[in-house]
């Protein structure tokens, strides 16, 4: 019976450690994804400002 308790404790402990590592990696991946999205938004905002600064193109017939 004591052997079964130790085995069960070991399995649960290793499972907990495994889940902890997975959660940590997931958080890191999410952080990297958020940084990429922020960079894209900054670039898009910069492109919109450049478009506002340029006069509209000349269109013949107007």
From Swiss-Prot:
Location within or outside the cell: Secreted
Superkingdom to which the source organism belongs: Eukaryota
Hydroxyproline, modified sites: 56
Predominant location: secreted
InterPro entries the UniProt entry points to: Frog_antimicrobial_propeptide
Residues annotated as signal peptide: 1-22
Stretch list, region Disordered: 25-62
Propeptide: 23-53
Basic and acidic residues bias locations: 36-55
Biological processes, Gene Ontology terms: defense response
Alphabetical keyword list: Amidation, Amphibian defense peptide, Hydroxylation, Secreted, Signal
GO cellular component, one term: extracellular region
Residues with PTM Proline amide: 60
Tissue distribution: Expressed by the skin glands.
Entry's family note: Belongs to the frog skin active peptide (FSAP) family. Tryptophillin subfamily.
Free-text function comment from the UniProt entry: Myoactive. Has selective relaxing activity on vascular smooth muscle.
Protein name: Tryptophyllin-1
Annotated organism of origin: Agalychnis dacnicolor (Giant Mexican leaf frog)
């Amino acid at each position: 019976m004591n052997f079964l308790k130790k085995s069960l404790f070991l399995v649960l402990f290793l499972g907990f450690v495994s889940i902890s590592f997975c959660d940590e990696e997931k958080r890191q991946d999410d952080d990297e994804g958020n940084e990429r999205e922020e960079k894209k938004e900054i670039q898009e905002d910069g492109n919109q400002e450049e478009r506002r600064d340029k006069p509209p193109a000349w269109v013949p017939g107007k």
